[in-house]
Amino acid sequence: MGFSDVYACNPFPSAAFVTQRFFVPINLAHTQKVSWLHGHENAGLHHKTFIQHAKLLAIAQLTYRINLKTKQLQIKFCSMAALVFSLEDLESVVPEVLGVD
């Protein structure tokens, strides 16, 4: 499928809406990992770009993965169809560098 083998399942709080952040290493050639951020707990990492996605309905869990060739982020909810986003499109909406407020 062209996706990395790194998946993540994260429980959501029971709140109606939450805001989550994703970051993707700029140098994708050296890593296939997409990590999950909560606030700025990893602000010490250098040269990372994070993407703050729109508010998501709180669901028990979700999984996400990245297609390294097409640079697409796929978010799959437990009981919903997968949503696929272009990383470039998301970065153009929220162009921020991790650790810089």
UniProtKB/Swiss-Prot annotation:
Keywords for the protein's UniProt record, in alphabetical order: Early protein
Top-rank lineage group of the source organism: Viruses
Functional description taken from the UniProt entry: Not required for CRPV to induce papillomas, but may facilitate the functioning of other viral or cellular factors involved in the induction of papillomas.
Family indicated by similarity: Belongs to the papillomaviridae E5 protein family.
Protein name, as recorded: Probable protein E5
Species classification: Viruses, Monodnaviria, Shotokuvirae, Cossaviricota, Papovaviricetes
